Curated annotation (Swiss-Prot):
Disulfide bonds join C46-C86. Its main location: other. Belongs to the fimbrial protein family. It is found in: Fimbrium. Residues 1-23 form the signal peptide. Coiled coil: none annotated. This is Type-1 fimbrial protein, A chain. The keyword Signal applies.
């Protein structure tokens, strides 16, 4: 009896495994998504590093007490624009210009903050300073101090800081600027 039961169990298991082996093994293909490839081929002395093209500078949290009156600034935070594959037989100097919306006509060197659904800070914007500490006009035509290029990789340092146009109120304090590089 035990042998008969064992034989039935073994035969049942074998029939199940053969059924699974005969199951449909046709592969299934589904749409996955889109991959975007972005870049640019340039005829210039250098190529802007991909990490510099679309970067975020973290200015962090700053107390309203630090920005309580017009002209007050936060501590500056450094950031860089890296140039790769530079060829000094093409150009020996580089400078950068930033373009963004100024907070108002009396402050052309202060970026306006973006609107935020959660509420934006007021009476404050963002300044960009070049390696010499000069505040840059955000018109896309006023360039930073020139940097002498070396063959290969070059780094152009900048700083950003909050600038109060009055007593700052709390809220999100984000701003955007684009940049372009001029080679000479």
């Amino acid at each position: 009896m035990k042998i008969k039961t064992l034989a039935i169990v073994v035969l049942s298991a074998l029939s199940l495994s053969s059924t699974a082996a005969l199951a449909d093994t046709t592969p299934t293909t589904v749409n996955g998504g889109t991959v975007h490839f972005k870049g640019e081929v340039v005829n210039a002395a250098c190529a802007v590093d991909a990490g510099s093209v679309d970067q975020t500078v973290q200015l962090g949290q700053v107390r309203t007490a630090t920005l309580k009156q017009a002209g007050a600034t936060s501590s500056a935070v450094g950031f860089n624009i890296q140039l790769n594959d530079c060829d000094t037989t093409v150009a020996t100097k580089a400078a950068v210009a930033f373009l963004g919306t100024a907070i108002d006509s009396t402050h052309p060197k202060v970026l306006a903050l973006q609107s935020s659904a959660a509420g934006s800070a007021t009476n404050v914007g963002v300044q960009i300073l070049d390696r010499t500490g000069n505040e840059l006009t955000l018109d896309g035509a006023t360039f930073s101090a020139e940097t002498t290029l070396n063959n290969g990789t070059n780094t152009i340092p900048f700083q950003a800081r909050y600038f109060a146009t009055g007593a700052a109120t709390p809220g999100a304090a984000n701003a955007d600027a684009t940049f372009k590089v001029q080679y000479q």
